Amino acid sequence: MIISMVIIFIVQTITQFLLHYFAFKYRGEKGKKALFYADNNTLEAIWTIIPVIVLAGLIIYGLFTWTSIMNINEDDDPMVIELYAQQFNWKARYSGQDNVLGMANVRLIDLDRANILGLDEADPNAQDDVITTELHLVVGRPVHFKMRSQDVLHSAYMPHFRAQMNCVPGMVTEFGFTPTVTTEQMRATPEMVEKVQRINKIRVEKSEALVAKGESALDTYTFDYLLLCNKICGKSHYNMQMKIIVETQEEFDAWMKEQKEFKNSLN
């Protein structure tokens, strides 16, 4: 990104200077006639070839960057998690001990059976899947996200991880990354401590006015990583928020033991 910005800034500075310089130099004046200049093959070749080379370089560099982001190396043993979007909430589905997600289809949703994501009950890989309303990640372990949407176009947006991918009805989209800072570590950084203090100071001031009106005070703000929807998906779009907890392997294992596997969650 820095390389692209530097190149764009240099080219923009030069071209904007020339644009304004020549507009001034060759401004209309009384008694001056315009010169008709039909063409110049050399100039046309220069201003065609140079942009082609620069743009091709940026595109090729971008493709390598995109590939490094989108290609998940299976040798790194990434944790496979499905992010399931629907109006107006998120669900996370963990792939269980086998690290393989079971087959699923919205046509298989059966609320009476508590099969809320439409998992194939006959698929052996689905039996140990775990469905949650919080997203817990292990620090330092790669994650392979697969995304589905039940209804309309949503967008899985994790601003703190600079990651975003559309959730498209009828197809599975995916990306991966490795979280490197736990939630507790992020909360302890000087920048975050200062930000939280500033936010809570404002909340205290606002709460005084609310309490004076007989209303409840605002809750104290605590930092959490968040999964948001970045597509306006309906009137309750704002409610599409899921807490993300980045923690140690031991903390994750303890949390996972408290969750029900799919086979044990059906009615």
Predicted feature residues:
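Non-transmembrane, membrane-proximal soluble domains of secreted or membrane proteins
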Residues: 1, 23-267
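Membrane-embedded alpha-helical segments of integral membrane proteins
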Residues: 1-28
